Amino acid sequence: MDLFEYQAKELFAKHNVPTTPGRVTDTAEGARAIATEIGHPVMVKAQVKIGGRGKAGGVKYAATPDDAYEHANNILGLDIKGHVVKKLLVAEASDIAEEYYISFLLDRANRTYLAMCSVEGGMEIEEVAATKPDRLAKVPVDAAKGVDLAFARSIAEQGHLPAEVLDAAAVTISKLWDLFVGEDATLVEVNPLVRTPDDQILALDGKVTLDANADFRHPDHVEFEDRAATDPLELKAKEHDLNYVKLDGQVGIIGNGAGLVMSTLDVVAYAGEKHGGVKPANFLDIGGGASAEVMAAGLDVVLGDSQVKSVFVNVFGGITSCDAVATGIVKALEILGAEANKPLVVRLDGNNVEEGRRILTDANHPLVTLVPTMDEAADKAAELASA
């Protein structure tokens, strides 16, 4: 889960990472009030989960509260690379002597953690890596040893930070590591990390990505979810622990196992070419347990999409046998009742497939069409969606 800058700074404050005071608002009047409260010039910053805010006019310096009001009026509603600005961070402006870069991230290729540090802060790190690779240090981090002050100082040295800031930078770097580990993050980035004229080290901008798989350890992380920007069907699926991604199509997809569901998307897209360009409407993996409750929840989510014209249920029975899946489908249709109002094409294969097919045949539900092969089922689902 990617965080907004203001949320990242809330975690900075929690872990004692020094930054500038500020608050978030969604109105221009709120921006003026915050600037008045701070009592110094401020930065008015668009809160979007995308880079390039400054170039798009989403970050402005305000010398007075009235300036903050004017800038906020101009920034709210601004479209930055497809992201509409709905919130602003109004933070105290800081004098800057130098700008640096520091981040911790997962190095998936080498199965370790990585610290990245550079004296060339305030610019895109990809640009630094491309044009000045010798100025960007990439330091592997042993998770068992962590990042103490001595190692943090070494990271700063390798990033070519000046000698006079090494001790202060080391303290901040070690705290950023504590945040990275303590919050189960996959990325913690500060760009720029600045030195002020009086030699303070401040994190002026922050980016944090949290590992959603660790949410069970962090019930407070639910506060960071941007529910207003999340598709309501995806929210409903998450409540039932279903892996759902909405797509722009007409054939709802329900399957067990990510690989099978991905293959189902492909065969439906291929079949749809013969039926007016019909496409998959979603990715939905119900996992290994296709109980009646899970199947009902999955159907409820898929049928809640007004674009869906038909549903393709594609299940390979393994640990969960096909008869259990078939029973789940029948009971799910009973649970949903009139809400289940679109045709279902069902393909079963694998463990106890004959019994599963018998259960669906005996149920004789008017919405259910049982098809033996994946290709035939995809074609039938596409045909029904195009009707």
From Swiss-Prot:
Please give the pathway this protein is involved in: Carbohydrate metabolism; tricarboxylic acid cycle; succinate from succinyl-CoA (ligase route): step 1/1
Record-annotated residues binding ATP? K45, G52, R53, G54, S94, E99
Which Gene Ontology cellular component terms are annotated? cytosol; succinate-CoA ligase complex
Entry annotated with the keyword Transmembrane helix: no
Q: Which residues form the ATP-grasp domain?
A: 9-236
Query: Where in the sequence is the signal peptide annotated?
Result: none
GO MF terms here are: ATP binding; magnesium ion binding; succinate-CoA ligase (ADP-forming) activity; succinate-CoA ligase (GDP-forming) activity
Q: Tell me which residues bind Mg(2+).
A: N191, D205
Q: Which residues form a coiled coil?
A: none
Record-listed substrate binding positions = N256, G318, I319, T320
- Pfam family name, one: Ligase_CoA
The EC number of this protein is 6.2.1.5
* GO terms, biological process: succinyl-CoA metabolic process; tricarboxylic acid cycle
Give the matching InterPro entries. ATP-grasp (IPR011761), ATP-grasp_succ-CoA_synth-type (IPR013650), ATP_grasp_subdomain_1 (IPR013815), Succ-CoA_synthase_bsu_CS (IPR017866), SUCC_ACL_C (IPR005811), Succ_CoA_ligase-like_bsu (IPR005809), Succinyl-CoA_synth-like (IPR016102)
Top EC category: ligase
Q: How is the cofactor bound?
A: Binds 1 Mg(2+) ion per subunit.
Task: Give the family this protein belongs to, as stated in its UniProt record.
Answer: Belongs to the succinate/malate CoA ligase beta subunit family.
What's the stated role of this polypeptide? Succinyl-CoA synthetase functions in the citric acid cycle (TCA), coupling the hydrolysis of succinyl-CoA to the synthesis of either ATP or GTP and thus represents the only step of substrate-level phosphorylation in the TCA. The beta subunit provides nucleotide specificity of the enzyme and binds the substrate succinate, while the binding sites for coenzyme A and phosphate are found in the alpha subunit.
Quaternary assembly? Heterotetramer of two alpha and two beta subunits.
Q: What is the protein named?
A: Succinate--CoA ligase [ADP-forming] subunit beta
- Which organism is this entry from? Mycobacterium marinum (strain ATCC BAA-535 / M)
